[in-house]
A protein has these predicted regions:
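Structural recognition of the beta-strand scaffold that forms the well-ordered cores
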Residues: 22-27, 61-65, 136-140, 180-183, ...
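Conserved small/polar residues in nucleotide/adenosyl-binding loops
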Residues: 216-225
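Aromatic- and acid-rich polysaccharide-binding/catalytic face
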Residues: 196-215
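Alpha-helical scaffolding within the catalytic cores
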Residues: 6-13, 47-48, 121-124, 187-199, ...
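N-terminal module-boundary/linker segments of secreted carbohydrate-active enzymes
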Residues: 1-23, 38-41
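Substrate-binding cleft of extracellular glycoside hydrolase catalytic domains
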Residues: 41-166, 176
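Aromatic-lined carbohydrate-recognition surfaces of secreted/lumenal glycan-active proteins
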Residues: 139, 172-192
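Active-site beta-loop-alpha junctions enriched in small/polar residues
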Residues: 29, 67-69, 141-143, 184-188, ...
Length: 227
């Protein structure tokens, strides 16, 4: 179980069990939007930082997942000062498969600057936690073996690996060194070869995992056994 970020004291788990949860999970949607109670991009980021710090102070492990928007989506607005506003983007934009987004956000692509702006905010979040020696388990581009997200199976394995490696390299160039990177394809997975078919490589990945949603306990157990 994880803390809820929809209130000020993160007390839901404690109210039920008598103790705070050991894992605090947050998504990048909270860094940019209203999930953590922010009323604009700046307050969303600050609330996400504050909640994460408080959870860590209470002994929790902090995790960050990402449901990044399709960076060709019209909900992304460019401000007059040249910055980008992702506040109105939600889960649905991660499922927007149009526009060949992955190709366009890599170096040389027309949306690379937009993607870097998004990563810059993730870097601000991570660096704020690193100042207090708080590590973050970072799970970007999960369920890549499925076809429902723009970074998923419609792209080649080579393109996906390039995206993953570029993301880590860029964040490290921004001074982010407190993240443990997770590779988490969609289960069930029957063989090692199937699991490794899009694996970004040991230089990029610190933790192996998988996503298993709406499957029976048996199928999740089978995938765990294969790993």
């Amino acid at each position: 179980m994880s803390h809820s970020v929809g209130n000020n004291d993160l007390g839901d788990v404690k109210d039920v069990t008598g103790s705070v949860s050991g894992i605090f999970g947050i998504d990048s949607l909270a860094l940019f939007g209203s999930e953590a109670g922010g009323t604009d991009a700046a307050s969303a980021l600050q609330k996400s930082i504050d909640y994460s710090k408080k959870a860590a102070q209470n002994g929790a492990i902090v995790t960050l997942s990402t449901h990044m928007p399709n960076f060709t989506n019209a909900k992304i607005k460019k401000n007059a000062d040249g910055t980008y506003d992702f506040y109105n983007c939600d889960f649905n934009e991660a499922k927007d498969l149009s526009g060949d987004s992955l190709k366009k956000i890599l170096p040389g692509g027309e949306k690379n600057e937009v993607f870097k702006a998004y990563l810059d905010t993730i870097a601000v979040y991570a660096n704020a936690l690193e100042q207090e020696n708080i590590p973050v388990i970072f799970r970007p581009f999960h369920e890549d073996t499925g076809g429902w997200f723009w970074w998923g199976s419609a792209n080649t394995a080579e393109s996906y690996r390039s995206l993953y490696a570029y993301t880590r390299d860029y964040l490290e160039s921004k001074g982010v060194h407190n993240m443990l990177y997770v590779y988490s394809p969609n289960g069930p997975l029957e063989t090692e070869a199937e699991y490794m078919s899009r694996y970004p490589g040991d230089a990029c990945v610190d933790i192996l995992a998988f996503d298993s949603v709406s499957y029976t306990h048996l199928r999740a157990h089978e995938t765990s056994a294969h790993l």
